[in-house]
Amino acid sequence: MAAMGHLGDPYALRSVADLPPPFRSVFGFRYFNSLQSECFPACFLSDVNMVISAPTGSGKTVLFELCILRLLSRFLSSEWRFNLIKGTLKTIYIAPMKALVQEKLRDWNMKLGSLGISCLEMTGDNEFYNTKSIHDADLILTTPEKFDSVSRHGIRDGGLGFFSDIALVLIDEVHLLNDPRGAALEAIVSRIKMLSRLGTMKIAPLANVRFIAVSATIPNIEDIAEWLAVPSEGIKRFGEEMRPVKLTTKVFGYAPARNDFLFERRLQSFIFDILMQHSRGKSALVFCSTRKGAQEAAQCLSQTASSLGYSNPFMKSMQQYEHLKEAALTCSDKQLQACLVHGVGYHNGGLCLKDRSVVEGLFLKGDIQILCTTNTLAHGINLPAHTVVIKSTQFFNKEKGLYVEYERSMVLQMCGRAGRPPFDDTGTIIIMTRRETVHLYENLLNGCEMVESQLLPCAVEHLNAEIVQLTVSDITLAIEWLKCSYLYIRIKKNPQHYGIKKEIPRELLEKQMKDICVEKIHELGEYGLIWTDEDGFLLKPLEPGRLMTKFYLKFDTMKLIVKASACCTLEDLLHIICHSAEITWIQLRRNEKKLLNEINADKEGRLWFHVVGANGKRKKRIQTREEKIFILANDCLTGDPLVHDLSLNQEMNSICSNGCRVAKCMREYFIYKKNYKSAISSMLLAKCLHQKLWESSPFLLKQLPGIGIVTAKALKTAGIDSFESLATADARKIESVTGRNYPFGDSIKSYLPSLGPKIDINIEDAGNRQGKSTIIVTLTRLSQAVGSSKQNYADMVVGSEEDNAILFHEKIKTQEFSSPYSVKLYVPCPPNARATLKVDVIFEEYVGLDIHKKHVVSREDFHVTKVFGIKKAEPLYNLPAESCLVSSKTTRTNQSKYHNGQNPLSKEVCVIEDDFRAKAPDKDDNDLEILGTREYNNLASLEAPSFTLLHEEDYEDVPDVLASEPVEAECKSATNNTIFDHIRKKSRDFPNLMLSKSMDSSYEPLILKKMKTSGDQFGLDQSSLHAYEVTPMVFDRTEARVSPNNTDERCRNILTRTAETRSFQFTGKMDSISQKSEILNRTQGKNSTQLAGKKAFEKSKTPDENSLHFVGKRDSSSEKSKALSKTPDENSLQFLGKMDSSSEKSKFCFSSPLADFQPMQCTKQVAASVQPLTIQDYCKDILASAKSSGTGASFLDVKSVFSFL
């Protein structure tokens, strides 16, 4: 490569032959021009970042291509063979406009296609890409907003998966930073810079990403160079001397008219004089903002020229006239024909392809001297002219619904058409604008306009996006992200522009930047969009923040959504949209008030909602922009709006498009909050705004292609106003009533299958289950969409009307879900009351297909026999949605049995169970079971074991978290009159063991979750696995309450000694589950310690402050299990169940009155004051005490003591 880059004369033109052989075919010329030759070493022979400032038309695109080839040279072998590995080195090309992206796409597909380079367009016009196509692409061409939107999905959704392969970023028209849209460009470049610094990217191409930025002439190119870390050799600045054609620029200012529309029309009267003065008989392009404006300008010039007769300045010869006359006859557009014969034409998207080709050919040949066109031609086909006239610097923005200034890049692009290098050595640019904006365009054309950052006004939205993508996870990274922005560069150079004092010291300036960052984070945290720790250091995204990023909403709009009521109606949500920041540009004009007042009066009763005053009556006068938006939205949603004004129509369309996006965000937010009424309302409003129809509109058929308001009215007159009536109507009748020709009726009816199949809802009450009504909701597909490949989606929502809670929600594919599809819900019902269950199937796209059903759950004699769950319940009207358990299946039903217990509880206690997933043996893996309890037939088997020395007490204080597996111990005792008598005597120091009062009233379930640790330990978690019924054996440890002479009896009832194995068994009744577990439950003082699992101990607080619980699972075959056993040959201690893989002696927590005894390390639930202790240590203490008593304990060892214990 070095040989290829032989320098020679630094001022000589570089030859294409200096490139490797595989790359030479990319260029259709032999030599690079002077600008390209000067940049050749930096572009192709190095990997430095670059910023190039040069006039339009000087050949900057070739510099991009040289940098692309430099990257591709990594795939060249030593023999100059090109071996591309697709998608491994990506180039991102970012341009301000879609037209420019599409122009470069066509150009590079032709030039680089022979090398096998895969180019992908990523704009709003092209949605036909997916994750795979992005990963396989070598060159991605996109706009800033689209790339920001795609990458905002983040690591979570794979949106940033391709970032590691980015090796080259090409930024066209980087002066876009000065436009309001520049914030998106600044954000994505900062994002790339942040990700490139991650340690995980060290070996990825992104770690050494290269930035190449080009722009028109700007004065502060050094600031952009500092932002992109461009070294001095990478900064290239070129003046007007690099233009192949010298340009003369003129900016004319005119007095404003009554409105922007009339101002643009008035400029047409000045165009002819300007062309006569500056065009001098040469070709001219007149750029107009709209298609109609281009056509009217051409007609005005044509009429003026025709009035001059033979003195027509646009007609040079009779031969030219004959050519134009023949060409006009080939055009289908009559207005175009009339203009062409006078040497004037117009070009816009409204012409057919043939007419546009004719016009382009005539202009290139010189037969047409004047061509009026829209601004899209500035980025389309190359039609240069000597003179360029920009008629008005404003255009009508469809999204905003008003006239706005052209972006600077657009103006420069149009100016770039001036001057034709092969034919002219000069060119002229004329800009016609308002008087107050003349200086802006003079500075722009002269390269005197400073490029400032536009990030600060929307910094909170972009910072939230970074937090959602996990690129910013703490406050230091947030500050680092801000320092990666162009804002940080400019705020140091021009602090006054950003509201900071000019003479502020550098240290205070840094603090000011940090304060800005902290302020934005505080705002996000205040409204629940992100989570921060107590110190405000750690940052984590929350669902509302993710939704704001996903739907590209402004922060002010998201604040309105977060503050919305949980029971919003359609009217409430429509008011939120009217106040949203996305449409704040819509203003109320004086000449619109009369029409808006008439619409709000609504004498025909068309509107669903009206603007009302404080007295609740309709307002007679519309006074604010929000009221205007509300009226326009309601008028549009009738399906037959009264508004026909062009400007109001544009605003109406913008309200619907932006409002639909806001409503979709509200839909997902209210689903997340489980607010049933607001969620249903937002689902309906989103698709109504999309279709511009209320669900009860008589013009629902407008949703079908080919049916407009006129056809819909004709069908309604004939009684065909719904999809059902259209399906049954005769095709010939449809054609007759609409006045359309065959086969219109068949064509319309053929679209019906694309709406989706018919679905039926069935709600079945399957009885009561532990204080809950078992409801089975079944969806059945009644028809199949035949001949339609379109995929339709619907939301299935089950909600409770009384507590406004979503009990179940799922998005389904209407053509593909397994029919019948059943969902089982266990719905709590208050005593002597009714609970209303609502089931809705809301189709995502089409209005008028939704299904709604209601079911009333009623229980007259309501009581709960057992408490299942982890906490005391609330009545239904206060019950959270999580209390409703769901079992979702396709055709099977749950076979679990119900309790027949005899222990009733208070009526105000309802069943609450945690959701979890479990696979039953008789169910498919795909079936989802969300159950909260395990039931048993024989409640008598759960009775408490009898102990001679124990007495029952009422269990008054129910603990919040209990053990999960039932173990009752049958304890036997056997003693010898040996040294162990001393141990018995010592045991008198231990408190009595007593059964809790709760044993005769209720059984509390415990949740058990296996938590892997390095020591094969297990921890308790109340939100995991099954909630089992248990009968806890409560050993209440208090001061000794029995006399010494009954101690032996107590030991005989508790301890059983087996001589052969020297082991003692605690046995209990096992449950039907085959697993085995032991749980030791102890409470010392007010600190409770919980250890649970297959090997676990749990300590919990009881009314007597100190009690010991032994619980375990029951074996389904023998109803017995050994809770603790000793293996003589291994001399090791083990718990039945899962053994330690190393066969080491298990350490476990053992109850002791000694304050310095330490339990084993466990999960976070364990009290911090308790420390680990092994059973060996405990036995050693007993043995030492026994030997010191002088009772002949020399033959004992630790193992024998343990066998006794």
From Swiss-Prot:
Reactions catalysed: Couples ATP hydrolysis with the unwinding of duplex DNA by translocating in the 3'-5' direction; ATP + H2O = ADP + phosphate + H(+)
Positions of the SEC63 domain: 541-852
EC primary class: isomerase
Cellular component terms per the entry's GO annotation: chromosome; nucleus
Biased composition (Basic and acidic residues): 1095-1122
Domain Helicase C-terminal: 266-467
Xref: CDD domains: DEXHc_HFM1, SF2_C_Ski2
Compositionally biased spans, kind Polar residues: 1075-1091
Residue numbers covered by motif DEAH box: 172-175
Domain Helicase ATP-binding intervals: 41-236
Recorded coiled-coil stretches: none
Family designation: Belongs to the helicase family. SKI2 subfamily.
Known role: DNA helicase required for crossover formation, complete synapsis of homologous chromosomes and bivalent formation during meiosis. Is specific to recombination events resulting in interference-sensitive crossovers (class I meiotic crossover). Works cooperatively with ZIP4 to promote crossovers.
Protein name: ATP-dependent DNA helicase MER3 homolog
